[in-house]
Swiss-Prot record:
The gene is CA1. Belongs to the actin family. GO terms for molecular function: ATP binding; hydrolase activity. This is Actin, nonmuscle. GO terms for cellular component: cytoplasm; cytoskeleton. Its EC number is 3.6.4.-. SMART domains: ACTIN. It comes from Halocynthia roretzi. It catalyses: ATP + H2O = ADP + phosphate + H(+). The modification N-acetylcysteine is found at residue 2. Keywords: Acetylation, ATP-binding, Cytoplasm, Cytoskeleton, Hydrolase, Methylation, Nucleotide-binding, Oxidation. The modification N-acetylaspartate is found at residue 3. SUPFAM superfamilies: Actin-like ATPase domain. It is found in: Cytoplasm, Cytoskeleton.
Length: 376
């Protein structure tokens, strides 16, 4: 099916960022926001060649005049027209390849609805005429990237978090838990608590500034109460941040109050369990014989696990929940922001994987439902 000299394309479509590149590479070539922007105002300059939509970084840089939309919500594609624009942009503008010449590996959220993976398959073969494609579960790829086939992955991106127990390469669907609490919620929460400090951030464009503050300054406290007391009595944790207009703001306990919401979702007015309890609950839904392997191989993945201090805190919290003699190991690879993509790059370049691709011929014979038989 797949000639050795043609590299497969690996596209990891996240709620916040799209990561794309070539199988066999150790990092994605293109990383851009999963955004489609449309002008808010009527164009007045004739002959400016104004477009009716912008994708990715271009939408980001023109955000002041655009309405920004994310076609992927909570990890699942909700707007297919915009999604097609993002894929088109990925192939033709970012990677500069002809999709009809390369097999394409796409990623999907755990528990992605069946109709969604069929639609992805259909668009790849019918709109982009790919010779072959495959859909892989994101968390499974992260586990491969860490060099394991058994473990539990806590994957948290911009739109959704999941705990996915995996045994010998197979995700265990009955034990997967989804938490609609991720990067975007933390950004919104930071916007809210900065407002209490007297700084006002409201528009979609300003949210991007707050996201940057979060990425640069936030961290997870090992002990929240102790940290709050430290913050109240000294200015040691205060940091300053320069806004695009030159104004400088000071950020204090917001730095760790923001990601604390991962462990205490009640901060966001959510009823759900924190990420440590969710991970524990997910392990407890698995067969008693494999739990030991999961505790010892807890892998963090995704951009919202990049906060300094998160692995130590996770270790502390899970030790408190687990049986006393249990060996617990939290693995937080430095490249975990891209580990889904890296896992895809590894998988698509394995010689044993080459017979797993869904070919155009198989698609023409069976239709979109072929994806359920070949990708699991």
């Amino acid at each position: 099916m797949c000639d050795e000299d043609v590299a497969a394309l690996v596209v990891d479509n996240g709620s916040g960022m799209c990561k794309a590149g070539f199988a066999g590479d150790d990092a994605p070539r293109a990383v851009f926001p999963s955004i489609v922007g449309r002008p808010r105002h009527q164009g007045v300059m004739v002959g400016m060649g104004q477009k009716d939509s912008y994708v990715g970084d271009e939408a980001q840089s023109k955000r002041g005049i655009l309405t920004l939309k994310y076609p992927i919500e909570h990890g699942i594609v909700t707007n297919w027209d915009d999604m097609e624009k993002i894929w088109h942009h990925t192939f033709y503008n970012e990677l500069r390849v002809a999709p009809e010449e390369h097999p394409v590996l796409l990623t999907e959220a755990p528990l992605n609805p069946k109709a969604n993976r069929e639609k992805m398959t259909q668009i790849m073969f019918e709109t982009f005429n790919t010779p072959a494609m495959y859909v892989a579960i994101q968390a499974v790829l992260s586990l491969y990237a860490s060099g394991r086939t058994t473990g539990i992955v806590f994957d948290s991106g911009d739109g959704v978090s999941h705990t996915v127990p995996i045994y010998e390469g197979y995700a265990l669907p009955h034990a997967i838990l989804r938490l609609d609490l991720a990067g975007r919620d933390l950004t919104d929460y930071l916007m809210k608590i900065l407002t209490e400090r007297g700084y006002s951030f409201t528009t979609t464009a300003e949210r991007e500034i707050v996201r940057d503050i979060k990425e640069k300054l936030a961290y997870v406290a090992l002990d929240f109460e102790t940290e709050m007391q430290t913050a109240a009595t000294s200015s040691s944790i205060e940091k300053s941040y320069e806004l695009p207009d030159g104004q400088v703001i000071t950020v204090g306990n917001e730095r760790f109050r923001c990601p604390e919401a991962l462990f205490q979702p009640s901060f966001l007015g959510m009823e759900s369990a924190g990420i440590h309890e969710t991970t524990y609950n997910s392990i407890m839904k698995c067969d008693v014989d494999i739990r030991k392997d999961l505790y010892a191989n807890t892998v963090l993945s995704g951009g919202s696990t990049m906060f300094p201090g998160i692995a130590d805190r996770m270790q502390k919290e899970i030790v408190a929940l687990a049986p006393p003699t249990m060996k617990i190991k939290i693995i937080a690879p430095p490249e975990r922001k891209y580990s889904v993509w890296i896992g895809g790059s590894i998988l698509a370049s394995l010689s044993t994987f080459q017979q797993m691709w869904i070919s155009k011929q198989e698609y023409d014979e069976s239709g979109p439902s072929i994806v359920h038989r070949k990708c699991f």
